[in-house]
């Protein structure tokens, strides 16, 4: 299947996140919402300046939809589907209870690089199942023949891929890793070191940090071969559906990103490898409420009933700073020095996607915050306002 589409009535369960402020009176619910009014109005005033129709020409004051336009030709084109987006929306949970929501929080929109963190969670599922017992083992040891066999790539470990220090070299479904060399992103505090797309000299794996979507897609391919099952199926059935989510969820690949696996039953299957974002189209479409469910599940320890789906040690490791990039963990942004995300605590972590997608786990307030389609230039103002509201709640 090119993607998974789940349309079903949601079942209530003990694990489903509450959709009301405190399951109390309307007056109390309104009081909860009023606490966050300033932050919500601020977010809604600063929608990302992208057209809502990804195929439409930008209006005055807007920029083209997506990030592929900044790539050198011929890589500056979409390779997978994109779809209409909604407006600014979001959800706030505190202690597992929804205390604020705005916009269309049940609308499933593409979330760009928030999907990277979902790949780290899938690697955690593989670890819990014994498929990935040692993240410091070279990837080629378990999945040979898919691009890790060269002299340079054979020393790359799973940990290198998860922290974006792999320096993997090659082409993944027609995209060369060079297209994202010298890439800079908004939350990387370092100055640009070169021109995006230039053939930067490679370093030893583990010694150089670079935000590179082709290498993330190579991690996704490796996880596909490790599970021997399409990653959207694993994510949906293992993580999202047990939380009561999944309506409208889909995880789509590029039009030509098909490969053959032998599944657990020994049957050959032609399946689609999915990207860890929407840089060239495809990727995860998911609602703000489902993103909040996932973040709250992470914050509270990664269990579903009696099953430890992802170990607490794995989740803690995701939030540990990379030795050479302390602003980053395992496909997660960090705030250990307090400067990358002013207003958030130094223990906070963020999943971030282009187009203004932020999923913020805030241990200091036992909270998770999701905002979609916020102009990233105004993310600091939003974070500061939400932090102030949480401190009063």
Regions found by a protein language model. Give the residues of each.
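Active-site Gly/Thr loop motif
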Residues: 259-278, 319-369
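Catalytic-site signature segments of enzymes, centered on catalytic residues
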Residues: 97-103, 111, 172-256, 282
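Active-site-proximal alpha-helical segments within enzyme catalytic domains
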Residues: 117, 215-222, 282-303, 357-373
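N-terminal leader/targeting segments and the immediately adjacent pre-domain N-terminus
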Residues: 2-105, 112, 128-133, 163, ...
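Structured C-terminal helix/loop/strand segments within mature extracytoplasmic catalytic/sensor domains
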Residues: 29-32, 348-393
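Active-site-proximal loop and beta-strand segments within enzyme catalytic domains
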Residues: 44, 48, 52-80, 86-88, ...
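Active-site SXXK
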Residues: 96, 110-135, 161, 219-223, ...
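Active-site helix/loop module of the DD-peptidase/beta-lactamase fold
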Residues: 129-169, 225-281, 286
């Amino acid at each position: 299947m090119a993607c998974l589409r789940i349309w079903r009535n949601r079942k209530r369960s003990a694990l489903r996140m509450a959709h009301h402020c405190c399951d109390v009176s309307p007056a109390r619910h309104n009081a909860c919402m009023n606490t966050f009014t300033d932050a919500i109005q601020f977010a809604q005033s600063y929608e990302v300046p992208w057209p809502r129709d990804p195929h439409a020409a930008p209006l005055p004051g807007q920029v083209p939809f997506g990030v592929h336009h900044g790539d050198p030709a011929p890589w500056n084109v979409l390779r997978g589907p994109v779809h209409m987006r909604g407006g600014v929306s979001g959800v706030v949970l505190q202690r597992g209870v929804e205390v604020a929501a705005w916009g269309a929080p049940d609308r499933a929109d593409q979330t760009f690089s928030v999907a990277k963190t979902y790949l780290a969670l899938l690697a955690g599922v593989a670890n819990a199942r014994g498929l990935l017992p040692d993240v410091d083992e070279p990837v080629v040891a378990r999945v040979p023949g898919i691009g890790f066999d060269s002299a340079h790539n054979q020393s790359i470990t799973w940990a290198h891929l998860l922290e974006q220090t792999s320096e993997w070299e090659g082409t993944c479904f027609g995209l060369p890793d060079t297209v994202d060399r010298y890439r800079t992103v908004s939350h990387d505090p370092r100055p640009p070191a070169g021109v995006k797309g230039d053939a930067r000299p490679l370093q030893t794996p583990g010694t150089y940090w670079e935000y590179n979507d082709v290498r993330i897609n190579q991690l996704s391919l490796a996880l596909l071969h490790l599970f021997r099952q399409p990653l959207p199926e694993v994510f949906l059935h293992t993580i999202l559906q047990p939380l009561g989510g999944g309506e409208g969820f889909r995880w789509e690949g590029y039009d030509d990103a098909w490969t053959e696996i032998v599944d657990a039953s020994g049957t050959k299957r032609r399946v689609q490898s999915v990207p860890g974002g929407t840089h060239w189209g495809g990727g995860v479409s998911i609602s703000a409420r489902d993103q909040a469910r996932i973040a709250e599940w992470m914050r509270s320890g990664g269990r579903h009933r009696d099953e430890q789906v992802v170990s607490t040690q794995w989740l803690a490791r995701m939030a540990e700073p990379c030795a050479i990039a302390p602003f980053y963990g395992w496909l997660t942004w960090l705030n250990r020095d307090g400067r990358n995300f002013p207003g958030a605590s130094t223990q906070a972590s963020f999943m971030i996607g282009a187009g203004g997608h932020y999923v913020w786990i805030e241990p200091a307030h036992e909270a998770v915050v999701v905002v979609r389609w916020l102009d990233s230039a105004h993310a600091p103002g939003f974070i500061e306002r939400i932090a102030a509201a949480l401190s009063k709640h």
